[in-house]
């Protein structure tokens, strides 16, 4: 039985939590919001709260994210980010 992209996201978070400290998880991963996964292009879009979080994830956790997303989504998954800096006014920037 095939699982939904949202379920794949939940599996990803569980695997990430097993590989980082609770403080790291709460600081860097808990604020991430799953936006969508395009199965045809294998593109995963996630929302992060700031450019700093995006940069920190890329510099410090890209290997872990790649490994986990390859396992839970697709071997060809392409990670994209949307920085949502102001949810009230829906200000965002795709990275």
Located regions from the model:
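Intrinsically disordered, low-complexity basic tails and flexible linkers associated
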Residues: 1-95
């Amino acid at each position: 039985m095939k699982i939904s992209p949202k379920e794949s996201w939940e599996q990803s978070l569980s695997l990430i939590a097993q590989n980082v400290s609770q403080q790291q998880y709460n600081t860097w991963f808990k604020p991430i919001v799953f936006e969508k996964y395009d199965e045809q292009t294998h593109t995963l879009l996630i929302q992060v709260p700031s450019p700093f979080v995006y940069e920190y994830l890329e510099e410090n956790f890209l290997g872990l994210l790649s490994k986990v997303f390859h396992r839970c989504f697709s071997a060809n998954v392409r990670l994209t980010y949307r920085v949502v800096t102001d949810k009230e006014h829906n200000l965002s920037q795709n990275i």
